[in-house]
Amino acid sequence: TALRVREEKVELLHTHCPIASAILARSLREVVDAPLVLTYHTKYDIDIAKAVKSRLLQESAIRALVQNVNACDEVWVVSRGAGENLRSLGYEGAYTVMENGVDVPRGRVSAAAVAAATAGYDLPDGVPLFLFVGRLMWYKGLHIILDALRALREQGQAFRMVFIGAGGDEKEVRAEVETLRLSDRCFFTGSIADRETLRAWYSRADLFLFPSTFDTNGLVVREAAASGCPSVLIAGSCAAEGVTDGRNGFLIEENAVSLCAKLTALCADREAMRRVGENAMRELYLSWEDAVARANERYAVVLDRYRSGKYPKHERFSDEFFNTQGDLMEAMSRVAEMRGETGRLCRELREGFDEAREALREKLEKEW
């Protein structure tokens, strides 16, 4: 691979993961004379915490991640919030916000296309339709959606809710819909890969519900905006960047009460949903082509800075890699020692309990 990269005369390396692919990119940079750009997409500390239970190993993994980021010549983040998350992990260098675009055109699809895509679902005319598109995981704010819908139903408000996507929590989400007695108005389509079918759902929906604080960019918000569907988002979240409440989207607090209140008000003002959706289409939409054009312009800046020697020299990857591996192995050793100590204490407690139980039994036998 290294030989082929050298033969291809690569001018720039770009990685989209600060872990595995960043390690590969750093090793390749020692073979080719090219700058390395990294795009930081997601809150890796949350992913690491889910995958690794040991606090020591979590901290070691995050240090390794930050070292990889520091080793890059330029760092891009998909939102200001993503940059703040990276800062919270210990990164102190500069970064550039480079927003992602969407690969769907601006504008709603035809009524016929909407009818074809949504056929078979009970979606009465005049009844507000809410939509969620994404992985069916609780951390996407799905509890907030379901609890708000339950309260909305209890108020007597008619509505329909469609979930598009799949995920590790799908079975639990479906079960919760049954428990809350929402199955007559909540539907699951599964994953939809066809872009035109997705556009049809966005075009049919009155509101896109996305109360997630996990996502660093929320491309689905721009996809919805492309079809004139306004989003309901958590104020201060990454997905809500660029959104003004009541102008090009709707903002709520991170709880079901706030979402229910917003939905109640909007169900009584369908014109507001339409108007804000039009503004979202004009103001939030960013095409993939425009995003790529901006990236290409920035590449030119990176190359100029690299050739001018404006980027600092970085430690050889091999040296830093082995240092990092040493730190990680030390952390693993400390975890093992802690587990061993915990096991020893448990054994001592168990042995002490057995001794006390035996002494008590002997005492009772003597007394009886």
Per-segment meaning from a language model:
Residues 230-234:
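Short hydrophobic beta-strand element within catalytic cores of glycosyltransferases
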Residues 69, 191, 199-205:
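Short alpha-helical donor nucleotide-sugar binding micro-motif in glycosyltransferases
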Residues 272-286, 290, 297:
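A short, well-ordered alpha-helix in the C-terminal region of glycosyltransferases
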Residues 245-246, 250-256, 265-270:
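Conserved acidic donor-binding segment of nucleotide-sugar-dependent glycosyltransferases
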Residues 174-192:
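Nucleotide-activated donor-binding/catalytic signature segment of Leloir-type glycosyltransferases, i.e.
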Residues 81, 101:
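Carbohydrate-associated surface elements
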Residues 213:
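Aromatic "clamp/platform" in nucleotide-sugar-dependent glycosyltransferases that forms part
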Residues 128-151, 157, 161, 168-174:
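A conserved mid-protein helix/loop that constitutes part of the nucleotide-sugar donor-binding site
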